[in-house]
């Protein structure tokens, strides 16, 4: 958005210099993209008088001029300089414009230096308008009236000394699309006083011959308010010079007084208006939704075909305007126009944005309406524009006609001065906070603050804090050191869950896994394969059909990654991921999971034959390593109760009582086929948050106690039912004497037809190694036999096992 400094000062009473205003605008959130200051470009060019002009002694087309200049202004003494000039109108007594040595001439891009032209010294330059980039006239040097004040800056005499400021307005600040909105922010900052904007209703002298109606369905969403009035007897000639100059300065082409006035209000007060030629309207105006197929020749000379639902302004005969976007050519005003209908309406931002985007029309009106103009200024803007038309174009106004009502945008939020410190960290006195909000147009009543109608972006208490901090300047926010603990060790920065997550990630990396980061969204079919896919985790507005549900497990994403790698020739891989999984949409139904996936072989090919397919024991070992890293206790139970996506008989679950900690095993072949993964593939999943925290926290780790006495190992072979799990035997043997037994491990299993032939149908043999570690004395044979008897007794009681003969 562009505006001039004088335009800003129409609304802001200030003595602040331009640089301070520009800096303040950027600091307030309105980024200044550029400043065109004529003073910096043309400030050195001053009015002068040619005392004498004689022919150049060495050139027929050049003139040798003695010029009286006032380099220090009209009140300072004059200086005489010699200038060689080639303009045909250079003559004695001419009043022109002089550029001294050292001046940059914008029209030529040259910095003036003392020179010698055809053997004669020349100091400075007599300028044409093209050399000053004021016009394309280069027939001669500037020729001013005799009464032009000597020594005055030419830009002041010409009236082209008004700086132009271009500001980038963010989409959330539609009030900044008017000069008055920017002036209000600057006044709140303290750079001046916002001038009042009195609105005096213009009395209606006759009923308006043009009526207005809004289609009932559009009053709720589309056009809540449409107002206007007829002004008859106007003279639609060129607008005044000051208005034309102001519009040109912001890049708008003056057209006629009526059109220029509407553009003036659009830029100055953020109030888009439109004028219809009454003579070209049949009956009244109707705001309605297009049925589809209607065509309108717009003011840009293009014909637009409307779709069903897009808003139109039509008379009794045909469409006349694209509502809130652009007027129609057929009802446009010309120099012959004498009676006009002035429109001021409030249009729904979403509807205007959708129509403008569909028709690919960009206009100043659309740009403002789709961001949200002030609905409460609809009628005051109509009155102010009416007064200006009467002043510049004459005529008389009718009574105001309208349909609809001003939308109720009133709302209030709690105003707590302490929130500025807690949210922003700035200490601003309460009185200053209240003054700031009131200067911005907020209404304060007790602990409530009501935003003005022109601020649709303010939607909560945090926005009040933002306004206060913005006006006070966030550049004043100073860094403060973090508070130090008064005594003792400071609290850890990371939570226990974050510490465990880091430990799991480091352990997986040490085990050789490559970490993946997959989407939290998967398709419904994949979600159902892993126990998900319910409506509770369906994404309302998915990115694509492959991301419709929140993932119930990390395995689908890792399997998809494995399939993509296999398709590119990578058969062996170790992938892992740590992230959230979702069982439902309620609080507490989200968990942190650490998952590893092994596919293919355990090692590269080598001459020693160590390469083998990955198996369930690889997954189990890695799962135990990660569990140990996150603090899981050594004694955990392993069961076969695993979900259906694991291979039955080649998988297991790790838990503490009813608390599930992890699952591991081969991925079910059906799942591999569905996910397009070529096996073998084993995996494990760990629910990190389910691992219990230590009950007792010690300041330091206790010293490791090692016995000086020699350990003793004894082997036991038990005959058990084929259904008995090895872990049951291990746990039973471990519990025989917890003080002496250091470890129990399975070292052999004998099963199958040969085993049953020796031991009976449905039987197998499991062999255990039990390590006994004394701490106070060396074990005797009697001690060892006693412990062995306990082990046999415990195992027999737990499993019905007998010692193998």
From Swiss-Prot:
Subcellular locations according to the entry: Cytoplasm
Manner of cofactor binding, per the entry note: Binds 2 magnesium ions per tetramer.
Alphabetized UniProt keyword annotations: Aminoacyl-tRNA synthetase, ATP-binding, Cytoplasm, Ligase, Magnesium, Metal-binding, Nucleotide-binding, Protein biosynthesis, RNA-binding, tRNA-binding
UniProt enzyme class: ligase
Domain tRNA-binding residues, every copy: 39-155
SMART domains linked: B3_4, B5, FDX-ACB
Annotated catalysed reactions: tRNA(Phe) + L-phenylalanine + ATP = L-phenylalanyl-tRNA(Phe) + AMP + diphosphate + H(+)
Cofactor dependence: Mg(2+)
Enzyme Commission identifier(s): 6.1.1.20
Domain B5: 408-479
HAMAP family listed in its UniProt record: Phe_tRNA_synth_beta1 (MF_00283)
Subunit and interaction comment: Tetramer of two alpha and two beta subunits.
Family statement: Belongs to the phenylalanyl-tRNA synthetase beta subunit family. Type 1 subfamily.
UniProt GO molecular function: ATP binding; magnesium ion binding; phenylalanine-tRNA ligase activity; tRNA binding
UniProt-recorded name of the protein: Phenylalanine--tRNA ligase beta subunit
Binding site for Mg(2+): 457, 463, 466-467
Matching InterPro entries: aa-tRNA-synth_II/BPL/LPL (IPR045864), B3/B4_tRNA-bd (IPR005146), DNA-bd_dom_put_sf (IPR009061), Fdx_antiC-bd (IPR005121), Fdx_antiC-bd_sf (IPR036690), NA-bd_OB-fold (IPR012340), Phe-tRNA-ligase_IIc_bsu (IPR045060), Phe-tRNA-ligase_IIc_bsu_bact (IPR004532)
Listed GO CC annotations: phenylalanine-tRNA ligase complex
UniProt lineage: Bacteria, Pseudomonadati, Pseudomonadota, Alphaproteobacteria, Rhodobacterales
One Pfam family named in its UniProt record: B5
Origin superkingdom: Bacteria
The FDX-ACB domain, residue ranges: 707-804
UniProt-listed GO biological process terms: phenylalanyl-tRNA aminoacylation
């Amino acid at each position: 958005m562009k505006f001039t400094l004088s335009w800003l000062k129409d609304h802001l009473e200030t003595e602040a210099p331009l640089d301070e205003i520009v800096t303040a605008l950027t600091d307030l959130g309105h980024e200044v993209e550029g400043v065109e200051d004529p003073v910096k470009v043309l400030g050195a060019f001053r009015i002068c008088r040619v005392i004498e002009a004689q022919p150049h002694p060495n050139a027929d087309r050049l003139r040798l001029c003695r010029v009286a200049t006032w380099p220090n202004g009209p009140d300072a003494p004059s200086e005489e300089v010699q200038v060689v000039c080639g303009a045909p109108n250079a003559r004695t007594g001419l009043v022109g414009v002089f550029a001294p040595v050292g001046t940059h001439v914008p029209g030529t891009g040259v910095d003036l230096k003392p020179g010698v032209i055809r053997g004669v010294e020349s100091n400075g330059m007599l300028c044409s308008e093209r050399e000053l980039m004021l016009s394309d006239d280069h027939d001669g040097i500037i020729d001013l009236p005799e009464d032009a004040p000597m020594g005055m800056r030419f830009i002041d005499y010409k009236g082209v000394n008004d700086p132009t400021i271009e500001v980038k307005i963010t989409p959330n600040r539609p009030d900044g699309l008017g000069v008055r909105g920017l002036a209000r922010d600057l006044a709140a900052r303290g750079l001046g006083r916002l001038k009042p904007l009195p609105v005096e209703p213009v009395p209606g002298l006759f009923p308006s011959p043009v009526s207005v109606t809004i289609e009932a369905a559009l009053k709720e969403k589309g056009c809540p308010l449409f107002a206007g009035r007829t002004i008859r007897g106007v003279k639609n000639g060129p607008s005044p010079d000051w208005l034309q100059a102001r519009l040109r300065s912001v890049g708008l082409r003056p057209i006629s007084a009526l059109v220029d006035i509407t553009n003036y209000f659009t830029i100055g007060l953020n109030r888009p208006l439109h004028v219809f030629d009454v003579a070209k309207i049949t009956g009244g105006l109707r705001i309605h939704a297009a049925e589809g197929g209607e065509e309108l020749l717009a003011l840009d000379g293009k014909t637009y075909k409307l779709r069903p639902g897009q808003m139109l302004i039509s008379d009794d005969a045909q469409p006349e305007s694209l509502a809130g976007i652009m007027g129609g050519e057929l009802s446009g005003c010309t120099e012959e126009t004498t009676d006009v209908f002035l429109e001021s309406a409030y249009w729904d931002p979403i509807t205007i944005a959708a129509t403008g985007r569909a028709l690919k029309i960009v206009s100043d009106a659309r740009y403002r309406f789709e961001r949200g103009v002030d609905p409460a200024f609809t009628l005051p803007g109509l009155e102010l524009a009416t007064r200006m038309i009467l002043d510049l174009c004459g005529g008389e106004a009718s009574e105001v006609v309208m349909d609809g009502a001003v939308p109720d945008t009133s709302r209030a939020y709690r105003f707590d001065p302490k929130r500025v410190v807690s949210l922003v960290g700035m200490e601003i006195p309460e009185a200053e906070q209240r003054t700031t909000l009131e200067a911005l147009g907020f209404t304060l009543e007790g602990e409530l603050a009501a935003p003005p109608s022109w601020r649709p972006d303010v939607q909560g208490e945090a926005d009040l804090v933002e306004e206060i901090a913005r006006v006070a300047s966030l550049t004043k926010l100073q860094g403060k050191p973090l508070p130090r603990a008064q005594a003792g060790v400071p609290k850890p920065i990371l939570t226990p869950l974050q510490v465990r997550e880091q430990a799991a990630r480091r352990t997986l990396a040490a085990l050789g896994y490559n970490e993946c980061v997959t989407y939290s969204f998967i398709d419904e079919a994949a979600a159902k394969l892993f126990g998900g896919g319910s409506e509770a985790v369906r994404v309302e507005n998915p990115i694509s059909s492959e991301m419709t549900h929140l993932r119930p497990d990390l395995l689908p994403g890792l399997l998809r990654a494995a399939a993509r790698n296999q398709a590119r020739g990578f058969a062996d891989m170790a992938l892992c991921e740590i992230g959230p999984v979702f069982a439902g949409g309620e609080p507490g139904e989200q968990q942190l999971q650490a998952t590893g996936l092994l596919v293919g072989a355990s090692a590269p090919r080598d001459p020693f034959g160590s390469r083998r397919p990955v198996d369930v024991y690889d997954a189990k070992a890695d799962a135990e390593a990660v569990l140990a890293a996150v603090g899981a206790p050594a004694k955990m139970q392993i069961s076969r109760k695993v979900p259906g996506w694991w291979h039955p008989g080649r998988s297991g679950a790790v838990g503490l009582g009813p608390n599930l900690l992890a699952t591991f095993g081969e991925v079910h072949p059906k799942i591999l086929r569905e996910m397009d993964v070529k096996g073998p593939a084993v995996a494990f999943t760990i629910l990190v948050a389910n691992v219990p925290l230590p009950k007792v926290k010690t300041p330091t780790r206790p010293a490791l106690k090692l016995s000086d006495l020699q350990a003793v190992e004894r082997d036991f072979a038990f005959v058990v039912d084929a259904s008995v799990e090895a872990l049951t035997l291990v746990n039973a043997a471990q519990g025989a004497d917890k003080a002496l037994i250091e470890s129990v491990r399975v070292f052999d299993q004998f099963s199958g037809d040969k085993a049953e032939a020796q031991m009976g149908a449905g039987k197998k043999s499991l062999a255990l190694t039990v390590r006994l570690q004394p701490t106070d004395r060396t074990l005797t044979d009697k001690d060892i036999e006693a412990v062995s008897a306990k082990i046999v007794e415990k195992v027999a009681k737990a499993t019905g096992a007998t010692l193998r003969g």
